[in-house]
């Protein structure tokens, strides 16, 4: 799929995990006490990594390693981010316990689509996935509200439909998924505007919101929510449920939800 996303103004930077930071400090000759003071675990032994994009376009890709070694992926990025994503997954054992998708835009599902289509073509990618969780609108909805992303929606829905029974898992508001000691809650119903409303980026507002409870720390993933979708969440989800210690800023931190969110 063609990459047409807006370009980011940031360098290709990847977050450093607590374990990697400890190794770096040890190499610098720091004492155990100094290392402990500068690498206090935020997630109680789990590690969250925000992967850097491999193109100049904005994307979203997160890996969460549980304390017990399970791996959770959120979105994954563009088609051209797939090789780097596969490399990072393999570094963590090559097995994904749960893959969560926020919405069917190429800068979020392209890498997974690349992976699934490669597997369907007979390639051994070296990656195994237990379950993929999603809630996408129908193709008729995309024809009405976001014709420009119809191709991506069609491709990812087709790929998911071709998976073995039980691997592709549609979700709804209130669903809870357990991966080791991590609890993931689906907070919202997908926002669907009235048929007479055709927004500029309705597919962004259709993002699913996932709350992850990781060893007492709450992480909120908001996808690409913008004003209408964000307001829908505020109207239908208890404010207490939206409170979080770590928040993925909606829509790459720009043109997103309101300040009230």
Regions flagged by a language model, labelled:
Residues 103-109, 181-185:
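Conserved long hydrophobic alpha-helices within structured protein cores
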Residues 98, 108-162, 167:
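Active-site HxH/HxHxD metal-binding segment of metal-dependent hydrolases
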Residues 78-81, 104-108, 138-141, 191-193, ...:
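Solvent-exposed loop/turn segments at secondary-structure junctions
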Residues 86-89, 113-117, 147-149, 234-238, ...:
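Short, glycine/charged-enriched secondary-structure capping and boundary segments
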Residues 95-107, 247-251:
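Metallo-beta-lactamase
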